[in-house]
């Protein structure tokens, strides 16, 4: 699928979820960067939240946003590592219809260029859930 340069840009509403046991609203730098990049790209922040590394809470938040007609997409930062606390992919498994396997592959390729083989510690992923990506 090629990008059509003639196609009109349509901004969407994006929700940002930070998953962390150690960050709060005052020091959520990853969430802040995502919000800034969403706005710089011309999209709108539809919602923002911070959840602890708890699969039930993450899945509940995602279900609420997926069901919200004002949210077009959700971006999550955190919880994709290899420790026992990292449960974001497992929470996504509870709400997804389909995986988008190429996302994780490209994410790790780009990360490899910066951090080398440490990128294998990331379980970054993307899914489709009831029409929300």
Each model region followed by its residue ranges:
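Non-catalytic beta/alpha edge segments that cap or flank active sites
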Residues: 1-133
């Amino acid at each position: 699928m090629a990008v059509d340069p003639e196609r009109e840009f349509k901004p969407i509403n994006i929700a940002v979820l930070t998953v962390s046991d150690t960050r709060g609203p005052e020091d959520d730098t990853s969430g802040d960067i995502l919000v800034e990049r969403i706005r710089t790209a011309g999209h709108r922040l539809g919602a923002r939240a911070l959840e602890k590394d708890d699969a039930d809470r993450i899945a509940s938040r995602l279900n609420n946003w997926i069901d919200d007609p004002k949210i077009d997409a959700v971006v999550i930062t955190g919880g994709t590592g290899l420790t026992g606390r990292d449960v974001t992919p497992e929470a996504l498994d509870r709400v997804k219809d389909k995986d988008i396997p190429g996302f994780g592959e490209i994410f790790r390729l780009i990360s490899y260029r910066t951090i080398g083989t440490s990128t294998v510690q990331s379980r970054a992923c993307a899914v489709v859930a009831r029409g929300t990506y």
